[in-house]
Amino acid sequence: MYIIFVSVFVPIVLAAVVPAALRRAGFAEERRWRWWLYAACILFWVSWYLPSPLIEGRDTSFTTHFVGGGMFTGLLWYYVKQSLGWRSRWPVELFSLFALVSALGCVNELVELGAVKAGISRLTLEDTNWDILANSLGVLVAYVGYLLVGRWIDRPRR
């Protein structure tokens, strides 16, 4: 039940709250880029139902973190970046992306700890390092995708 709740609740809240917050802050252009947010939310939802590999003989949530952590964050970052009209050099963009995935990963691990301690879920908390690696690799794949495709999308039109 925990997985179903999180996989549905988080994307719905994000899809409602983030655009409203950006519009309230005066970024009316966010609507133009909103499909990236919706794609991120769908990716997050799907990630909960993908199989993950055994690592060192233990069941992990590696794929969930790779897709629903790292790649999701990459799409969310791109949506926010475009909505804000923010551009920078690639090292600054990459740093901002890793800062975002790290912050969201930290929040996720705290939620997992809280769910375990409250008896809501029976997760093993021993795979945190693998979760960090999966999030980082997923966001790196998303950034490479951005470099290959996103910059082409961003280029000024004539």
Language-model features, listed with the residues they occupy:
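Divalent-cation-assisted or electrostatically stabilized phosphate/pyrophosphate-binding catalytic cores
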Residues: 131
